[in-house]
Amino acid sequence: MTLPIACSLTDAALQERRRDVLQKFRNAVIETRESKDGYSYQLPPTEEWLTELANLMNLERQCCPFLRLSITVEPNNGPFWLELTGPPGTKEFLTTTFN
């Protein structure tokens, strides 16, 4: 079964929350790295951002079930990286949604 490359949120409150979280995310991104199947985003290594990333990942798995999401926490208080990848079409979706 192929999942569509589209947001599937229908509840207005969830959509609004996602917009708020995404705006905060965009403002906090330190660096973006392109990969074959998506992007990785570097974020500040704070407790607040670890919580925000978990929040964002939860919203995205409800909204975009085609996404593969992972967080890398670098050692020695290094940065956090959120990696988003998926099937063909994912990069284009991420470019319009996250970048």
Regions found by a protein language model. Give the residues of each.
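Short, conserved charged micro-motifs
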Residues: E48-A54, G89-L94
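Accessory DNA-engaging acidic/polar modules
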Residues: A28-E34, T90, T97-N99
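A common structural junction motif
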Residues: N58-L67, F98-N99
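Short beta-strand-to-loop capping motifs
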Residues: Q42-E47, L82-G86
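Short, compact, well-ordered microdomains
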Residues: L69-F98
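Short, ordered beta-strand-loop transition motifs
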Residues: T32-G38, T72-N76
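A short linear hydrophobic-aromatic micro-motif
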Residues: V29-I30, F66-I71
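An N-terminal amphipathic alpha-helical segment
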Residues: A6-S35
